[in-house]
């Protein structure tokens, strides 16, 4: 399903009844689908490994996804990059296997949901994760980040004034 609706800027049809339980790759699926705003919370995404840029530029998308079981996903790079309307809870997601979260909420200007319970010990890339996510101001003080995790510009251009993640070897910008 990788790239299936990539660039389909007018697409906004119901998909919630689709069976996606065998799918492993949803990279760029709604990339640039700027009008898309349909429910997807019933999708069984248990086997998906890749969600790279899945909703990148899906600027109208604001549907619940908290019921998704993302336990097997390893790549969420840019997943909501530019999804400017998105502001739904994701606190039930188990992200223990994710290694890449760079740019995940970059320019997701409405997003302001709790993520403090996420276990991010395995993440190696958080560069620009919240850059330009201008509404985001949730505590992340319980996050323990690896010393080798890239965190450049993680909170640049935000109003973030809450507890920051712990990175034992250096400061987070």
Give, region by region, the residue ranges found by the protein language model:
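Negatively charged
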Residues: 2-173
